[in-house]
Design a protein with these regions (language model features):
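Secretory targeting signatures
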Residues: 1-20
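Extracellular, repeat-based ectodomains that mediate carbohydrate processing or recognition
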Residues: 15-478
């Protein structure tokens, strides 16, 4: 990717033209994805090249402002707003990875560097000084073997279930959750000692026992509710209100469904513990369901986040600040002229990224809403990448990837989005179209096989925390 620095939005960028490749595209839409006559938010995003391969990255930001971008076996750190990056792993950390994940505890600043070692176990490392030094447990997972799709997160203790002994722990003030799939089951464990070991937990009951074991990230709310999203046909969430001792399930989104193959749905919670669940719908738009009672009930009429001009999407991610203030990222395509044409299997293409032909290109989009809890929320979307992130199909089913000048599974399974303590948004993604692919006039899918780690963050614009107001670019005197 050739872009660096800020993407500055102007009034001309609001013009919507089908199948264009202009650098900046801006949309202001309602809950049906339709354009509304409102001014766009003043969103300026800054790009950073991490300088290493970075498929399925995780991102987190400590209170000091250090950014951690974890992909493959390398915990990359930048403490100068993405100007420079360094691999800060030491000998206590995993030497290789079969599946990476990273997490920054927003309360304690503990940085977790997590790696699946084959399917046998998980090597969990952690740092309490911005990656200056690390500790680690090379065998820190539940029953073995076949532990896959690992995830970790932290959250507050409650006064029920595992929270009763956990709240008395003098070792670490937060609960640490570790989830993975084993065949058709999702297993989640709770740690009383900051992730050094996981003493309690097991297979989650409900949807996770018989409807597929793959799942999205773990999300926690300020009130202690924990969410896990199963990768299932009907959008659903699994949640616990007792620090993982017991779990319940809820479904939503039957009005829009999901595609096949499908990737993870994701949940975010705001400062009042309202929850926002997003997923790719059956028409390949990004959809939202909201809960205002800590996951007990969810609205059954889904809201469309992505503009209708974006006809194919994957890899949605979300985070939230104060009530109604959310940010979402995803990969998407506006090549609507390819709908109904032939896909890579010679069948009629319906927008599924897994089967997209070489005339379809995918960009990175970031969407903001500052009133997402309203009856009529407004979504502000920016296509931030000036050139494609991927040309042609994106493998969404590891058993059906294609060799088109190399595997189209170069991006792997997900991107990531998190906010810092000031409500500034950071997006981690893998760029599959760099160098000649990005600058060429006729780049093809076989040119789009890189997996370069990259990041966008909000340079200036509204914080997701209302009290912060508008953020300015780092180094700006106000």
């Amino acid at each position: 990717m050739t872009l660096s620095g800020c993407l500055h939005l102007d009034n001309d960028s609001q013009k919507i033209i089908d199948d264009t490749e202009e650098e900046t595209r801006v949309f202001v839409t309602n809950s049906e994805g339709l354009s509304v006559e409102l001014p766009p938010l003043p969103l300026n995003f800054v790009f950073s090249d991490v300088g290493e391969d970075g498929p399925e990255p995780s991102i987190g930001i400590t209170s000091s402002g250090c950014i951690f971008f974890i992909a493959l076996e390398k915990p990359m750190r930048s403490c100068d707003h993405g100007l420079t990056w360094n691999n800060v792993a030491d000998i206590t950390q995993a030497p290789f990875t079969s599946d990476p994940y990273g997490w920054v505890d927003p309360v304690t600043d503990r940085v977790f560097n997590i790696h699946m070692m084959g399917l046998e176990s998980t090597w969990i490392g952690w740092s309490d000084n911005d990656g200056g030094s690390w500790l680690g447990n090379p065998h820190d997972s539940g029953p073995i073997p076949l532990n896959d799709h690992i995830k970790l997160a932290t959250g507050p203790w409650v006064d029920e279930g595992y929270g009763i002994p956990g709240g008395l722990s003098p070792i670490y003030e937060q609960a640490v959750y570790f989830c993975y799939n084993k065949l058709l089951g999702i297993f989640c464990h709770t740690s009383f000692n900051g992730g050094a070991t996981f003493e309690v937990g097991g297979q989650i009951f409900g949807l996770a026992t018989g409807d597929g074991g793959l799942h999205g990230a773990i999300t926690t709310a300020p009130d202690g509710t924990v969410y896990v999203t199963p990768r299932v046909e009907t959008p659903a969430i699994i949640f616990s209100k007792d620090n993982g001792y017991s779990w319940e399930t809820r479904t939503m989104g039957e009005d829009v469904g999901t595609p096949y193959p499908r990737k993870n749905s994701e949940v975010a919670t705001d400062s009042d513990s309202n929850a926002y669940h997003i997923w790719t719908g059956g028409d390949f738009g990004i959809y939202l369901s909201r809960s205002t009672d800590s996951g007990d009930t969810w609205e059954q009429e889904s809201a469309r986040i992505s503009p209708i001009e974006v006809i194919s999407t994957t890899f949605p991610q979300i985070d939230a600040g104060d009530p109604g203030r959310i940010a979402i990222t995803y990969l998407g395509s506006e090549n609507s002229s390819e709908l109904g044409g032939l896909d890579i299997d010679g069948q009629e293409w319906d927008g599924n990224p897994h089967y997209a032909n070489g005339n379809v290109s995918y960009h990175l989009y970031i969407t903001y809403s500052l009133n997402a809890l309203d009856a009529n929320p407004i979504f502000h979307t920016v296509r931030v990448s000036p050139d494609p992130v991927q040309i042609g199909s994106i493998c969404l089913n590891s058993g059906d990837c294609r060799d088109i000048g190399g595997s189209n599974r170069n991006l792997l399974d997900f991107n990531d989005l998190h906010i810092d303590k000031d409500g500034r948004v950071y997006v981690a993604f893998a760029d599959g179209c760099t160098g000649v692919c990005a600058t060429g006039n006729n780049s093809q899918p076989e040119d789009s096989r890189s997996k370069t780690g990259a990041m966008y963050y909000l340079g200036s614009g509204p914080s997701l925390f209302e009290s912060v107001g508008n953020l300015v670019e780092f180094g700006t005197n106000i």
